[in-house]
Amino acid sequence: VSASYDDVTLLAALIQCEAGNECYEGQLAVGAVVMNRLRSGAYPSSISGVIYQSGQFPPAGQGMVASIAANGPKSSCVQAAQQALGCSDNTGGATCFSRASSGRAGVVIGNHVFY
């Protein structure tokens, strides 16, 4: 997947919102979910389309992603975004995630479960 600087920044900003306090593997996993959605054909066909799809990632709809993107995401989130864009997937193909405490079956990484 070819990605512009803006795509990397936007993905990194989402990662920071959703997993900024998680370990690096947890940050990468959030990026992998976006890329898995992009490749699936069941979601919008651009990184921004996936991130801003209505009802999917609350921080995007609430303006937090745009704010972090404008101010520059932290370096670990940028690195995770770049690695996810490079097709690195530590979730087993997951297209969704939620809090691990939800009890949902899936791959648990940090405080999230990916499915």
State each model region's role:
Residues S2-Y115:
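Bacterial extracytoplasmic/cell-wall-associated proteins, especially those involved in peptidoglycan
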